[in-house]
Every structure is written in structure tokens, then in C-alpha cells.
């Protein structure tokens, strides 16, 4: 009995294992799994419904159909367990063995396994070094293959057609051996000597020079080595025995009406068995060769269909014309085993219902309908009822609950107390989509949700539904309370800002409460404290907005963490004094002494959390909510039509704009501007007009002028309802108010181009039919986009999670000195992100020195919290080197110091935190907010007037970087380089502003000159790009042939003529290869050289360029030779939003990437070919020069004789991340990807911490390619896990051997996920077949390191609370203490248990 109990305990424990290995199954192994051979295609008898003997459901092979009962009924009941009935041959045991016992089919002829044949690259083909087509022709009996050449001139593996075979037979007789079909391939594979082949290939590899051959050889060597090392035999890729799946995994269920529902696998197996039996019979009869051959081919096809239907030829379809689901289909895809049953399971103890508001709840509570609670907590209630003796049996308890007796409700109350439940709203995009609450029982049928957690769930109350789950075990309840409770999730893991922030009504209420008003009732009173303020407000003696003096006591923490009070009289308003009553001790009064908008409230809660900690913040947040709701109700703010005040200036602004447009139209008709320029200018005019109208409107709404008590006029901020809602951040924005009371403005077509007639009306005036019709375009586009976006965003999140899922914090400090240099993000005159936001919560990589001194301000390895950041700001530090996960030296994980602060908790990150998944969720969750294209606010085109000048905001000195310029005839500098940057440096040498200066801009100030604030330093024409000459001389046209490469356009109105270069598409055949160009020559007709080089000045003209000069005209340096009309920004290919983020993470090469210098050296140009120039870089140390061919149409940024650094831009374009990694290193590529991704998110106003993006970049960089092997056993050109190389090199260096040299690879997230070491994780992601095939051939072991693998095998994940469990397991295993198995078998135990139960129920065994 003791043994039995011991065993039952052990039953609940799973078998301990450390790794999963996948390999090819040998025929003997398949036979050893099997419990008998399936010989007949029959399934069950249609009359008795009993399984047929030897059929696909045979009870003798697979086990009994009923528990402990043989098929013929001779042996029933438990006492006969283990007996094999002599009549029907069935073992008496549990019926669940039908889920695990397999059978087999002995194939009459070998068949190839289609996965190893057709999954590219074909493993069989690679092993035999034969093309797949040839192998297929052999397998499907179209040609012969020579197996032994013998003494003949036939090679082994040679393919012979029928005729060739017959000729050879006549010539050589039986000297040689040639066969067809799978047995031929099997023989070839059997005869291979893998080790010898391997040696031979290695020799070849050392001798060969050709790159392609090397690649092919390495591939074969890798495959052969995999076979040798894994112990797989090549001939096992050909099946001679086919395993049969246990019958309960391919069920056959009788439906009513005599029909059966069956799994497709049964049909597929039936075909195989039928064909196999027929083939056996034909072989016994010694049938003619051609018939046997046909039958063998059909058998091969049947086995193919069973393993992977549709991979070869047409898929076999069932009766309903649908392709049958084969074994491969069972495991792959969203509906396959991995994603449907292993990674996502449905759970019991859950319910769902509509949500509604619970404004009276506390933050940690939710309202749960009584009906739901009763159903969810049933087992607990039954238990309690029995425990109290209110019900004698479970059955009685059940009856009581069904009758809903009064006592049941009391018990329910007890059960629910302190038992948290989980609330989840789909889609769960980040971890805050599931939180724990304490249930409060309510009447009704809707779940009540606390308003402050809506932001985290992204929930609203327009009919959203939520699911409730009950954590059952004690551990689960503990985790729910300690980790998942809504009160523990105040900060967002994406950016560390509070996510429990009031919104909408609450914000409006607090804003209304803290506004001040001139001449309000009770102005000028002096009050003794907040209590009195509330009293006089309630009594109606003073208005909420009255400006008064109040005595306030503020508390501050001293050195001993005691609160010290300080009382003073402060100018404030009645409302602010009342609000002060709920602010916790320890915060300054200045925090409420302002009109509180949404940002201010968020900041207030953040400050509270940082100063006072979690508990006061939660209480404070709750209080603000109650107060906000109360005062929003009192304020009576609502929207009426008169709140939308249309500015008086509107008509005048619009008529001015119309006049300007008419003028441009005239210029166009007289040929001064091209169609494209006209369109752009018109759009610019309207965009500017729109801005002016909205400015006039906002000025009008914002303030009204009132005379105060002293008779002085002052600007009073308006109490207009619409304005208050927008200003407080409760609802609406300036852009929306503009459409209500300004003008709707320009609209976009669905393709993103902007319609040039704007909608001048607004919604208050109403739209006419045409205007309404124009606006429907954009509005519909918005809806269609949203639908597409959601799916795309979800897929991006899935790829991110998959690539980062196994990244966990595994140690405290890796001790690296590597780091990333952080500087503020400056775009134009604005600091987009100050330094403090970028370094807050990171760990310093080196000491920070106080600027201008040698004093250490912050030591290395300091976590920069708010106080440290204040210190940095105080000393105006403008660059800090911080630790980053990309440089972390930890193997298979990250250290806490390189990660820094846990954003959701505010302290340094704990070991075991799953930072990979957090990063993926933080990047993926806002994905739905990113637009697919970057313009549209309700369809209105948001496009500012194009920039045409640079105006600095502060005073300072100018610094130009990578600038080249010439002085034009007017003595002004003209920029002739393409990625010039202009920085404004203040007197301390800090960068204040930074601008991009385009090619062709005229500079008002030169490098190093001083400028005053507001001065314009550069200007240019935004709509055309000039081609500027760098030398003076005369023009000579080359290849400019009228009608072939150029056409002359004469304007009818003005008679001005200009030349337009034709696009290559528009040219005649003769003009295709011509390169129109302008050459500059001197008076004698000789080429003028570009200064500082020996290149002639020749300017190639791209298509569409307009030349307004004639051949032979004299020009001077800095003049424009031609104009290239720029397309508007609407159609310029800036992939915005989500697709851009996906491109960056997939590390896709841009279409025409920038060309970067491969080495540092001096530029020169070699011999040109027809369409390309030869760029030569000669290194300074005299080593081998580097050559590259560059197409002539690429604009070059460098001149002959110029010195370039490795990684400098030679020719413009978007940079390819792979090039950046290769030439500038890991940190540069990290910086590039981080900044580019952040740009997209910043545009949408989404804040994400850089850390998260760095985590993903680390995962993209986790592979390395071996350049030279050293003493290691890697192959050259092999791609290996970066950690593996590091560990191997450490060992080699420790033993004084030569380390392997490698270069880091940048993989896109999909590639990186598929290249992970764990084949289980990769197979559950994408391309399941390919991953499993590769893994099986290599005999891979999965060490179950990541999260996904552990979820799939059903273990605790090695992160979070499971981290300790896994660490402990590793320790125990290292110490060699693994739990001993009990001495009872599963069968015995469950049987004895059943016997006990029967005895207890008074049943007797002897009837």
C-alpha cells in the first residue's frame, strides 16, 4: 500500500530529462516500437463496429477498445489485467494504450522518404552528389542507375535510359549492375564509405580555388560529417518498414445515420496497405516487370502522400475534393501540433463577459458577476460545503449549488476572499494584457473594470469582452498576487513611464479643478488651509477657480527618512488647495499649483513613485481618479455648436491663397515652372494657408482679454469647452479642432498622393457634395489600412518574440568595458530626445569626467538613476558611455549590468528576467498604432510646407561636417556634397542644433563663423535639384542628340526653349547606350580639370533633367547647369511606419544602397568600361589597392586624390546595415538600427526605451562566420553561434593554441529565428518540414535552453519563477542526485487504486 501511494505521488512528477534528440529511425527501431504488423486495409466492421483483426484499428495490435475488457468478452474486470485472451488475442489492460501503441507495415519494396528527397536542398541528392531530377527519374522508374560498374566503362551513379541499359546489357552482359527504383538508391547509399568520402572531399577542398566549388564541397562535408557523428546511416532515408500511428490519434467516429467521420490519415494508410498487398501478390505471381514496376511506383506515391501530401505532383484529394491532411500537415502551420496544442492550449476554469466601468473600485479590485463566480469557484465551494458538514457528499453539495441556497452565497464570499483572478483582454499584445485582481461580487452579468487599467489593456467600454481565469494552485495564487496584481504594474515595461494614468473625464476634472480665473467669486481671500478652502467652496462663498492665498504645510523627507513639515502661505486657487488634500506627504505643493493636463498628471504620479514608492502611489492614483470624476461632473463641460468659433480672418487668408495659386497657374501657362513644380508650389501654398487658419483659430480660442480688479487688461485662458478638452489632453487635438472650426485642408488620395484642391470648409460650416466626396477617399483608406495593419503588426510581434525568446538575464556582471556612446538626439533646432532620457536606468561603462576638469563625476558601473541624471544635467555633460546588451560578454544570456534598470520596477534587473520577450512585446505592441504610410489624420494630409532654408534658433558658431563647396559668381558658398551636416556649437562646445544641408544650397555663413539666433544660414529651392559646376569655362554638349537622348521643349506663350533629357525608357534604340553629359572646356577647347584631381569636369545628366543653356555658353563656378525637378514628398519613396520597422529588423538591403569605402586610403579612378567607372582605393601603408566597379549614373561623393576612412560614404543612398556592420563594427550597426527604428516610433509619439531594440539587435548578431579555423574544429566559411566561437576560442587560448578568426553576421529576425540552436523552437516557428529534416539528418540534440522549447515539452520556463527551479535542477544534476524511481509500475498502481476504490464502493469481483 505504501508503495502504491509513493507511486501515485511519482505519477504526478514528469520524467526528468535534460535534452531531446532527433534522428533517423532505423527499420529495426521502427519494428521495436511496433506491437504488430498491420496487414489489412480494413478499419472496423460496419455492423458490429468492432475493429477488424490485423486491420488499421486491430485490438490485438493496438490494445482493447474498452478498459480492462478483451474484444470477445471472455475476460472482463480488473483481476484479469495483463492476461492475453487466447480467443481474440487482445491483452486486457486500459484502453488508453491505444493512444501510445504503434504498429508497422512491412513494405514489399523500399520507398524513399519524401522529406529527405524533396525538402531543399535534397539530402539524398547532396549525399550521392546527384541532381534531384536524376534521382527522381530513378525513383519513379523512368531510368536506371549504375550501382557497380565492374570492369565496364560505366561509372557508378551514372544514369541510363531504357535504351542505353539494353545496349549495355547486350555489350557487357552481367559484368555490371544497374537498377531502378528506391532499391537502387538504397544500394547506392549502403555502399557509401562516409569517412573515406569525407577525407577525399577535404583534400579536394584544400586543392580547389573556385568559390562555388568550395561552397558545394563544404556543404557536402558538413552533411557527411553530420551522418558520421550522429550515427545515422544514409540508407535509413529509404524506408523498408513504415510505422503506423496509434489509432486513437487518427480516430474513426460513427456519426448518426450510419456514416463515419474519419481522420484523413486512415485513407492514406489504406492506400498504402492496398498497394503494398497488391505488390506482394504480384511478386509472388512473378508478374511481368512492367506491371511490378508500375505497382512499385504507385506504392512510392502512396507513401509520399502519407508523409507529406502535395509535396510531389498533385495532392491526393478525398471525396470532397479537398487535399487530404498528411502527417506533415498535422505538425506544421497555425493549426498544426506545435502552434495549436503545444504552444497554445485552452484552459478550464475560465469565463468571459462584456466589461463595464467600475468607478468606485479600488485599483486592485474588479467586479465579478455572482453567476460567473459561482461557476468558476465550484470545486472550492463543494469542498467548503463538505468541510463545514453542510453537505454529506459531493453530489449533495452539487445539488445545493444548483438550487443556489442562501448558505452557498456565504460560502462563495469566503472562498473568493483573498483569491485573486486573472483578467485578460484579447489581443494580448504585451504582458500588461493579463493582470490579477481581487474579485468583488456584483449583481448583473458584466465584469466591472477599474478605469485606470484601461490604458494597459487598451480597453474601452463600447462592447469589449474580457476573459476571467482562476489560478488554482497555491503557487499560482502567490504569483498572481505578488507579480501580476494590477497594483504591481504601475510602470510600463516599454519605457518606464507610469501606465496607470488618468485619461479622459478624470483629466478634464482635475484640469478644471486646477484652472484659475480672473475676477472669480471670492478672489483675494486668505484661507487658513485646504480644509477651509473646501468649506467655503461647498458653502458657495467662492468659486473653484478663485485666486486666493492659502496656508499650506509641505512635508519633505530628511536624512533619517522622517517627514519634516514646512508651512507657508502660497498664492493659489481654491481648487488646487482642495486637490492638495489627497496628495501624499512628501511631495512639494508646486506639483499641484499649476493647471494639470495629462502630461503633468503623469509626471506627478511618476515623481510620487520615485520619491515615495509603490503603496502611496497606488492610493494617490485611486484618489485622483475619484476626485477627477467628481469634479468633471460638477464642471458641466459639454460640447455645443457655438463652442466651435470660426476665426474672422479665415475668408481673407483663403482668398489670399487663391490669388497666389492663380498666379502660379499663370506662371505655369507661360512656361516659367514645370507641371511638377506647379503642383508642389500649390500644395505648399495651401499647407501654409491651412497652418495660418489653424493658428488664427487657436489664438482665437485660446485666450480672451479681461480687465482684472486693478483695472489692468490681462490675457485670460479661455474656458471654451472644446479648447479645455484639447488643452488638458482629455480628448481631441489641435488637428481635430482645426477640422471643426478652421478648414479641413488638403486631403490624400488612397495612394498617398495629395489632392491639390483643398477642402476650405470645416465641419461647422458643412461640406458641399464635392468636398464630401473628396474626403471619403481618405476616410476609407484609413479603415482599410487599420485592418491590414493589425495582421502585419501581429506577425512582426510573433517574429520578434521568436527571435528573442531565449534571452534571459543569467548573471550579475560580465565585467566588460565595452559600451555605447550616448548623445542627445538633435534634429534641426529641436532636441528630440535629451541625454537624460537616453541614459536613465543604464549602467556607466567608464568613469564620467566633469567637463573642463579631471574630476570623476560618476564612477564606472554606476546605475544612473534620477539623482545621477540631475547631476549630469547640472554639469552639462553631453555624452556618456553606457553598457549595452549588444556588447555583453555573457554566454547564452545577458548580465544585469549590461541591461541596467528593470523599467517596470525601477531597480536593477533581477536574474531570470525574460528580457527578450519583454523587448519583443514592447516593440510589437505599439505596432498597431504605427500607420502603414506616414500621412493621414482622418484622411487629412499632414504635410508641412517644404523646407527651403535653415534658420538657427540659438546663437553660436557654425560647424560644417563632410562639406565640399565652391564659391559662385556672387561670392557666396554653394554646397556640392551630398550629406553635409551643419551643427550649431555653443560657447561650451556642445552641439545645440543639427541640420542636413542639401546639395546646391547657398550658404549665408561659412564654417566656423559666428551667427546670432534667428539668422538664416542657408537657403535652396526645395522643388528642384540643381547640377552645379565646380569650375568655370565653356559648355560642350556630349551625347545630347535631339530626338534620341534629349527633346527640345519650346513654350508657346514665352517662346523660351529648354532641353529635357529623356528617360532611358523613352529613348529610341539608338539612344539607349548614349550618356548625355555636359563637359566644361576652356577657351582653347581643352578639358578643364576639377581642382585637386586629374578628372575632367563632366556632368552626367539623369533622365527628366532640364537644361536651359546652349552649347558653347560661358559659365562660372557655382552656377547651375541643369535642374532636376524633385517629386513631391508625397510620392518620394519613404517607407514609413510598420513596413519600415519590419525592413530594419529583417535587415533587408535597400534597393540602391550607399556604396561605402572598404578600406582607408586615397581615391583614384581606373580604366572606365561602358557603363561603369572603376574606383580604386590605395591604402596608405602600401598594401594591395582595393578596386570596385561603380555604375556611372551613381553620383559620387569623393574626388580623385581625396582620403577616405573605412566605412565612409563613396556614393549616396540608404545605407545597408550589413555594410555598416562589416566596415564600422557592431556598435555602429546597433546605433543605426536603434536610431532608424526610434525615428519611426517617435513620429507617432510612441516612447520605447533603446534597450529593447538593442536586445533584438543582439539576437540578430548571434551568428558568426568562421574566416580562418586556427586550431579549432570549425570549417572555414561555416556559420556558428557566436557564443560557441567565443567559448571555443577561450579554451584554445587557455591551452596556448591558435584561436579561430571570425566575422559577425547580421541576420534578419526570421532568418535568426530559424538559425537558432534549438530545433524545437525553430520548427514551431516556420518551415517546420525543413527544420526537422535538417535536424534529423544531423542527429541534433536540443538542450532546451530557451523558453519556447520548455513550454513545448511542458516544463516550467527557465525564466521568472521557473529560473530558480532550473538552477536548482542543474545543481542537483551536477551533484548527481536525481530522484529515484519508485518500485511499482504504472499499470500496477492504477489497477490497485481502482481495486481499492471498487472495494470501498462495496463492489465484488466474483460475479
Swiss-Prot record:
SMART domains: RPOLA_N. CDD domains: RNAP_beta'_C (cd02655), RNAP_beta'_N (cd01609). It catalyses: RNA(n) + a ribonucleoside 5'-triphosphate = RNA(n+1) + diphosphate. It is an enzyme of class 2 (transferase). Its cofactor is Mg(2+); Zn(2+). One of its GO terms (cellular component) is DNA-directed RNA polymerase complex. This is DNA-directed RNA polymerase subunit beta'. It comes from Enterobacter sp. (strain 638).
Amino acid at each position: 500500500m505504501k508503495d502504491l501511494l509513493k507511486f501515485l505521488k511519482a505519477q504526478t512528477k514528469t520524467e526528468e530529462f535534460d535534452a531531446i534528440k532527433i534522428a533517423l529511425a532505423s527499420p529495426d527501431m521502427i519494428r521495436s516500437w511496433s506491437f504488430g504488423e498491420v496487414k489489412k486495409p480494413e478499419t472496423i466492421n460496419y455492423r458490429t463496429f468492432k475493429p477488424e483483426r490485423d486491420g488499421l484499428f486491430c485490438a490485438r495490435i493496438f490494445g482493447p477498445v474498452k478498459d480492462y475488457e478483451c474484444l470477445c468478452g471472455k475476460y472482463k474486470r480488473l483481476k484479469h489485467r495483463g492476461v492475453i485472451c487466447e480467443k481474440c488475442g487482445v491483452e486486457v489492460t486500459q484502453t488508453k494504450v491505444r493512444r501510445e501503441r504503434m504498429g508497422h507495415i512491412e513494405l514489399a519494396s523500399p520507398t524513399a522518404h519524401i522529406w529527405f528527397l524533396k525538402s531543399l536542398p535534397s539530402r539524398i541528392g547532396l549525399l550521392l552528389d546527384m541532381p534531384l531530377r536524376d534521382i527522381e527519374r530513378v525513383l519513379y522508374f523512368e531510368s536506371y542507375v549504375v550501382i557497380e560498374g565492374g570492369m565496364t566503362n560505366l561509372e557508378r551513379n551514372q544514369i541510363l535510359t531504357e535504351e542505353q541499359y539494353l545496349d549495355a546489357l547486350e555489350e557487357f552482359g552481367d559484368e555490371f549492375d544497374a537498377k531502378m527504383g528506391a532499391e537502387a538508391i538504397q544500394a547506392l547509399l549502403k555502399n557509401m564509405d562516409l569517412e573515406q568520402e569525407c577525407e577525399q572531399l577535404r583534400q579536394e577542398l584544400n586543392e580547389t580555388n573556385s568559390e562555388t566549388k568550395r561552397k558545394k564541397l563544404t556543404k557536402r562535408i558538413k552533411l557527411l560529417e553530420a551522418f558520421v557523428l550522429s550515427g545515422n546511416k544514409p540508407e535509413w532515408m529509404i524506408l523498408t518498414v513504415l510505422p503506423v500511428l496509434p489509432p486513437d490519434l487518427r480516430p474513426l467516429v460513427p456519426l448518426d445515420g450510419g456514416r463515419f467521420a474519419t481522420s484523413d490519415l486512415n485513407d492514406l494508410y489504406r492506400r498504402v496497405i492496398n498497394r503494398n498487398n497488391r505488390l506482394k501478390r504480384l511478386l509472388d505471381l512473378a508478374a511481368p516487370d512492367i506491371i511490378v514496376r508500375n505497382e512499385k511506383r504507385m506504392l512510392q506515391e502512396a507513401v509520399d502522400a502519407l508523409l507529406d501530401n502535395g509535396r510531389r505532383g498533385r495532392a491526393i484529394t478525398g471525396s470532397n475534393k479537398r487535399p487530404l491532411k498528411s502527417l506533415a500537415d498535422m505538425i506544421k502551420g497555425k493549426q498544426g501540433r506545435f502552434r495549436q496544442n503545444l504552444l497554445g492550449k485552452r484552459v478550464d476554469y475560465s469565463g468571459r463577459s462584456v466589461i463595464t466601468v467600475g468607478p468606485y473600485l479600488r485599483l486592485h479590485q474588479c467586479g465579478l458577476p455572482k453567476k460567473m463566480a459561482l461557476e468558476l469557484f465550484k470545486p472550492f465551494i463543494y469542498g467548503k460545503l463538505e468541510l463545514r458538514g453542510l453537505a454529506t457528499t459531493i453530489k449533495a453539495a452539487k445539488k445545493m449549488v444548483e438550487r443556489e441556497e442562501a448558505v452557498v452565497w456565504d460560502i462563495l464570499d469566503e472562498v473568493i476572499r483573498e483569491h485573486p483572478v486573472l483578467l485578460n483582454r484579447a489581443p494580448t499584445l504585451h504582458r500588461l494584457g493579463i493582470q490579477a485582481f481581487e474579485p468583488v461580487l456584483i449583481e448583473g452579468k458584466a465584469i466591472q473594470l477599474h478605469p485606470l487599467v484601461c490604458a494597459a489593456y487598451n480597453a474601452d467600454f463600447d462592447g469589449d469582452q474580457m476573459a476571467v481565469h482562476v489560478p488554482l494552485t497555491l503557487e499560482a495564487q502567490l504569483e498572481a498576487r505578488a507579480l501580476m496584481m494590477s497594483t504591481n504594474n504601475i510602470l510600463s515595461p516599454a519605457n518606464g513611464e507610469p501606465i496607470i494614468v488618468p485619461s479622459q473625464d478624470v483629466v478634464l476634472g482635475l484640469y478644471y479643478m486646477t484652472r484659475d480665473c480672473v475676477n472669480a467669486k471670492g478672489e483675494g481671500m486668505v484661507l487658513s488651509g485646504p480644509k477651509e478652502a473646501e468649506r467655503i467652496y461647498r458653502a458657495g462663498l467662492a468659486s473653484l477657480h478663485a485666486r486666493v492665498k492659502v496656508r499650506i504645510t509641505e512635508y519633505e523627507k530628511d536624512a533619517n527618512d522622517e517627514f519634516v513639515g514646512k508651512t507657508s502661505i502660497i498664492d493659489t486657487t481654491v481648487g488646487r488647495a482642495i486637490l492638495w488634500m489627497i496628495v501624499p506627504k512628501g511631495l512639494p505643493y508646486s506639483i499641484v499649483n499649476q493647471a494639470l493636463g495629462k502630461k503633468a498628471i503623469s509626471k506627478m504620479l511618476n515623481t510620487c513613485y520615485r520619491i515615495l514608492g509603490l503603496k502611496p502611489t497606488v492610493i494617490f492614483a485611486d484618489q485622483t481618479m475619484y476626485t477627477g470624476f467628481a469634479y468633471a461632473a460638477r464642471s458641466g463641460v459639454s460640447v455645443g455648436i457655438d463652442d466651435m468659433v470660426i476665426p474672422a480672418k479665415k475668408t481673407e487668408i483663403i482668398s489670399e491663397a487663391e490669388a497666389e495659386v492663380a498666379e502660379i497657374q499663370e506662371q505655369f501657362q507661360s512656361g516659367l515652372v514645370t507641371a511638377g513644380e506647379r503642383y508642389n508650389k500649390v500644395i505648399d501654398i495651401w499647407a501654409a494657408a491651412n497652418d495660418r487658419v489653424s493658428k488664427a483659430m487657436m489664438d482665437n480660442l485660446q485666450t480672451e482679454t479681461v480687465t482684472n480688479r486693478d483695472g489692468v487688461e490681462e490675457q485670460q485662458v479661455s474656458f471654451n469647452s472644446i479648447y479645455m478638452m484639447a488643452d488638458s489632453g482629455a480628448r481631441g487635438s489641435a488637428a481635430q479642432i482645426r477640422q471643426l472650426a478652421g478648414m479641413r485642408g488638403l486631403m490624400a488620395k488612397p495612394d498617398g498622393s495629395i489632392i491639390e484642391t483643398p477642402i476650405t470648409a470645416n465641419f461647422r460650416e458643412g461640406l458641399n457634395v464635392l468636398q464630401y466626396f473628396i474626403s471619403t477617399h481618405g476616410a476609407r483608406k484609413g479603415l482599410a489600412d487599420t485592418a491590414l495593419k493589425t495582421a502585419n503588426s501581429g506577425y512582426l510581434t510573433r517574429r520578434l518574440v521568436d527571435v528573442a525568446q531565449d534571452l534571459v538575464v543569467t548573471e550579475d556582471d560580465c565585467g566588460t568595458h565595452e559600451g555605447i556612446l550616448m548623445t542627445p538626439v538633435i534634429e534641426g533646432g529641436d532636441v528630440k530626445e535629451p541625454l537624460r532620457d537616453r541614459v536613465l536606468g543604464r549602467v556607466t561603462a567608464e568613469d564620467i569626467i566633469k567637463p573642463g576638469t579631471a574630476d570623476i563625476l560618476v564612477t564606472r558601473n554606476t546605475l544612473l538613476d534620477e539623482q545621477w541624471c540631475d547631476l549630469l544635467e547640472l554639469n552639462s555633460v553631453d555624452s556618456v558611455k553606457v553598457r549595452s546588451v549588444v556588447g555583453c560578454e555573457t554566454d547564452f544570456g545577458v548580465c544585469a549590468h549590461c541591461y541596467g534598470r528593470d523599467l517596470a520596477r525601477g531597480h536593477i534587473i533581477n536574474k531570470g528576467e525574460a528580457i527578450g520577450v519583454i523587448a519583443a512585446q514592447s516593440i510589437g505592441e505599439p505596432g498597431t498604432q504605427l500607420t502603414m504610410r506616414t500621412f493621414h489624420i482622418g484622411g487629412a494630409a499632414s504635410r508641412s510646407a517644404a523646407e527651403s532654408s535653415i534658420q538657427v534658433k540659438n546663437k553660436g558658431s557654425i560647424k560644417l561636417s563632410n562639406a565640399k563647396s565652391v564659391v559662385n559668381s556672387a561670392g557666396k558658398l554653394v554646397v556640392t556634397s551630398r550629406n553635409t551636416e551643419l551643427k550649431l556649437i555653443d560657447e561650451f562646445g556642445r552641439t545645440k542644433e543639427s541640420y542636413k544641408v542639401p546639395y546646391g544650397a547657398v550658404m549665408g555663413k561659412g564654417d566656423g563663423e559666428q551667427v546670432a539666433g534667428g539668422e538664416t544660414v542657408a537657403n535652396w529651392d526645395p522643388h528642384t535639384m540643381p547640377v552645379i559646376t565646380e569650375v568655370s569655362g565653356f559648355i560642350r554638349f556630349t551625347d545630347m542628340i535631339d530626338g534620341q537622348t534629349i527633346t527640345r521643349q519650346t513654350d508657346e506663350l514665352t517662346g523660351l526653349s529648354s532641353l529635357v533629357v529623356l528617360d532611358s525608357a523613352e529613348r529610341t534604340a539608338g539612344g539607349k547606350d548614349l550618356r548625355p553629359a555636359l563637359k566644361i572646356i576652356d577657351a582653347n577647347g581643352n578639358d578643364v580639370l576639377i581642382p585637386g584631381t586629374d578628372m575632367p569636369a563632366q556632368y552626367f545628366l539623369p533622365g527628366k533633367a532640364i537644361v536651359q543653356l546652349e552649347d558653347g555658353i560661358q559659365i562660372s563656378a557655382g552656377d547651375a547647369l541643369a535642374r532636376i525637378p524633385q517629386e513631391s514628398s508625397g510620392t518620394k519613396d519613404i517607407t514609413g511606419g510598420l513596413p519600415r520597422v519590419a525592413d530594419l529588423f529583417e535587415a533587408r538591403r535597400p534597393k540602391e544602397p550607399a556604396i561605402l569605402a572598404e578600406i582607408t586610403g586615397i581615391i583614384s579612378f581606373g580604366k572606365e568600361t561602358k557603363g561603369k567607372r572603376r574606383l580604386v582605393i590605395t591604402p596608405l601603408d602600401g598594401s594591395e589597392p582595393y578596386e570596385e566597379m561603380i555604375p556611372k549614373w551613381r553620383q559620387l561623393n569623393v574626388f580623385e586624390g581625396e582620403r577616405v576612412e573605412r566605412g565612409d560614404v563613396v556614393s549616396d543612398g540608404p545605407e545597408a546595415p550589413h555594410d555598416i556592420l562589416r566596415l564600422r563594427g557592431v556598435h555602429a550597426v546597433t546605433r543605426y538600427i536603434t536610431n532608424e527604428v526610434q525615428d519611426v516610433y517617435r513620429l507617432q509619439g510612441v516612447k520605447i526605451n533603446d534597450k529593447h531594440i538593442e536586445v533584438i539587435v543582439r539576437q540578430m548578431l548571434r551568428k558568426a562566420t568562421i574566416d580562418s579555423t586556427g586550431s579549432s574544429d570549425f570549417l572555414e566559411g561555416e556559420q556558428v553561434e557566436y557564443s560557441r566561437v567565443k567559448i571555443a576560442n577561450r579554451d584554445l587560448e587557455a591551452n596556448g593554441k591558435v584561436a579561430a578568426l571570425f566575422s559577425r553576421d547580421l541576420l534578419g529576425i526570421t532568418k535568426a529565428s530559424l538559425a537558432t540552436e534549438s530545433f524545437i523552437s525553430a520548427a514551431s516557428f516556420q518551415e517546420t518540414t525543413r527544420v526537422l529534416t535538417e535536424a534529423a539528418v544531423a542527429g541534433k540534440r536540443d538542450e532546451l535552453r530557451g523558453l519556447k522549447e520548455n513550454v513545448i515539452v511542458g516544463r516550467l520556463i527557465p525564466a521568472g519563477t521557473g529560473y530558480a527551479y532550473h538552477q536548482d535542477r542543474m545543481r542537483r544534476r551536477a551533484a548527481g542526485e536525481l530522484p529515484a524511481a519508485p518500485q511499482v509500475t504504472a499499470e500496477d498502481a492504477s489497477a490497485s487504486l481502482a481495486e481499492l476504490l471498487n472495494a470501498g464502493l462495496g463492489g465484488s469481483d466474483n460475479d
